[in-house]
Amino acid sequence: MNSLSLLLFCIFFVFSTFAKKVYYEAENGKLDGVTVYKSDLTGFSGTGYVGRFENPGNSVTVTVEVPQTGMYDLTIVYCANMGQKINSLTVNGQSAGDITFTENTKFEDLNVGAIYLNKGKNTIGLVSSWGWMWVDAFVINDAPNAAKDVTSKLNPTLINPKAIPAAKKLYDFLKTNYGKRILSGQVGAAGQAGDEGQEIQRIQKATGKLPAVWNMDFIFESNDCTWRPQNPDITEMAINWWKKYQGKGIMSAQWHWNIAGKTGDFAFYKKDTTFSIDNAVTEGTWEYEKIIKDIDRVAGHIKKLQAVNMPLIWRPLHENDGDWFWWGNNPKSCAKLWKILYERMVNYHGLNNLIWLWNGKNDANTPVDYIDIIGVDIYANDHGPQTTAYNTHFDFYGGKKMVVLSENGRIPDIQQCVDQNAWWGYFQTWNSEFILQDSYHTDAQLKEYFTHKTVMNMDELPSFNVNSYEYQSGNNNNNSSNNNNNNNSSECFSIPLGYPCCKGNTVVYTDNDGDWGVENNEWCGIGNSSSAVVCWSEALGYPCCVSSSDVYYTDNDGEWGVENGDWCGII
């Protein structure tokens, strides 16, 4: 193990130490609606810079050449002296995500993160969305990055130490499959839960599958709403769905929080309501009292879900990095409102079935200690893997939080996600035309994505309706390491080497230190090598069965089972 760790370190050291930066000047690229400038601004490289991206679709594209396929760090040298701007990055003609350019007064480097480039020539472009900025150069390293480790630093437990067993099991399930599988997901009709209407019907007809992750929206459940579904109400719908599938499904929820100010009608769009988030997070105001009553109402619904052991991936205050919702584009007040929601729901109402998903701005105000999972909403013009967006969010949290596509228009190409290490925990396509119209998804595309070997659908899920469950690793302290040292050091040689002891005894590697296994995506030492059981199927390219498995086939090698849609050796 020591030699293996040293080898990995040396590889990373070589890449990071000797990679050189190569500049590709914007003024030498292909220009569409932008102009080359050579004065006004100073501090640029080359012979000039380009701007101003005045109209949607204006772009600059450069051709770069790399020695091998891989992930390459990209830096854009820019000036945004007309205010903060958001514009779109393309790589080889595909959308790679939106880039936020912070306001400045001179040319500065913006590290965009890693992008996937093929061996040989590739194109990198910037396309106007908000426009009105200047670009000097695109800069990449001349050697690819080492592969990103997406699992080893994940928080081992939920942030709520009182989480119910069903929520613990769901989180462990998501964590265990993160970096290996991508779960399918779909949004149904507004105000519905477990809705098997036209969206689900289209998927099932085209693919023969049901999504792993379903969605509900408390859009009509605030006190100001004058209409909401009845008989059944939204909670009854969710419970009926939970019972129908015997707990073998995952439900997510957002809350388009309709609310009225002192004048005007209720709404969730900022332009349609006079309600103030700044006042709402100030105790003693009528706005504060109003949000507490709304939270209490929704909490009453979620309590009914908890009563039947139903966990919920909870996504309130979604898309708060934008300015279209009344809670958006106000980082300090939004973070404060998030904490009010958490304290009221968890500590006051005792809602311990929630997995808290943050879908918004990443900055110094982000309430990191109140977040389990990170969600990103992307409505791209193509089926690109959105690797840049994935890396930006994953890196901000230091690899401690899973990142999912909490909303998408087009499903990202699954194989490209795998190739580019964009391990979205799940995708969740919006309803209506985004899943119904061929302009977004053809039947062939849906079948390709839902039946891809990496994608997990509802038929592969276990039941999460459990009354007892302990985390597979860690404890209820997200600041601790992922090590699960259940065996004492006198029994396990790996403890002094910085690795936990294995709970099981399946050998996947042996060196001078002893026998090693892998549990929870981490090396672990097998304490009593005399009792070790060799995973014979590893040598044949197949894992050993993790749980007890029915025998599907027997040959000269041994008995075979099936887990997660793949053969596994029974030991």
UniProtKB/Swiss-Prot annotation:
Residues 491-527, 534-571 form the CBM10 domain. GO terms for biological process: substituted mannan metabolic process. The active site is at 319 (proton donor), 407 (nucleophile). Pfam families: CBM_10, CBM_35, Glyco_hydro_26. Residues 22-141 form the CBM6 domain. It is an enzyme of class 3 (hydrolase). It catalyses: Random hydrolysis of (1->4)-beta-D-mannosidic linkages in mannans, galactomannans and glucomannans. Its EC number is 3.2.1.78. Residues 1-19 form the signal peptide. GO terms for molecular function: carbohydrate binding; mannan endo-1,4-beta-mannosidase activity. Belongs to the glycosyl hydrolase 26 family. This is Mannan endo-1,4-beta-mannosidase B. The gene is MANB.
